Amino acid sequence: QQDLSEIMDDCHIAEEKDKEGKIKGRFEVKVSLKGTQPEVITQKRILDKKEEVKDTLASLYNKYKAGFDLQFKLPNSYSSYDSQDDFIDYYPFVPYQFKLIMQVFNSFLNLGYVAKEVKGNERSIIKVIHSTAKANADAELGKFISFDELYNNMFEEGLQARGQKAVDNALRMARTYQTDKPEKTRLAIRVVNVLFMICNISQTDQLLFPATVDNVTSLLVNNMDTPRLTIKNEVEKVVEFLCDNNIIRREQGKQGAPDTFTFYSEEEMKVAQLIQSQVVDNNTQAEQLKDIFNKYITALR
């Protein structure tokens, strides 16, 4: 029903509205998939748990609940697990992921990074959640799905040329990070995927979920046993590597706020690389300093 409405709006065919109304009239209840509905639908279709495993999940919750707020350190309007029931309903996903991935889809649509068919992205989100859950079907109990895992094959295949172009340089650079240590290279790719998603949400959403090292760290958490500080330290190294190679730039936080990061555009990247490639020899530096010194002394006289 909702798809029909959106198709009519897209086509701008006013005279078809009456036909649409007649079709809708055959249904007693119009079920909306807007707002928080993807969470409800996903829980029922994909994440609904068998009764016999709920006790096991309850035990897992009690084992880890003291660490959730630390491992999944999130901005105020994004949540981890509020209760045992919440945990059972969402596991192995984390509640904030539904809100954030919807913001990513909406923004990618506006930027032209994904096909127009993604409109009505509630269904696209359900498909991404389903494909991610399916890919983790054999994972051990206690494993959490991290946000970067939502950027999976299905998501990538939906990228238009414009979206692919925006992330290609970053991924190529990430694949050169500590190539003698495959796990470090994989982490660099994960960081790029997360940054690509959260650096491209709307300006309003970025105020709520800025691209900081802490937030990137939270999005990469996939277990409760690896200390958060260990993950954060590795993320910082990757971020510095990407900054040094003119993939992203650091923007200093104001009034004590943490620094944020954003991708260079292709044009900005070329300029940054050109500036970085300019080598000034010692003689040139000496001449420049001499000129400055002479001008300063002359002004004093």
Protein language model features and the residues they cover:
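Extended alpha-helical interface modules used as scaffolds for assembling large macromolecular complexes
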Residues: 2-5, 12-22, 75, 107, ...
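Amphipathic alpha-helical segments of the small helical/lid subdomains adjacent to P-loop NTPase cores
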Residues: 3-125
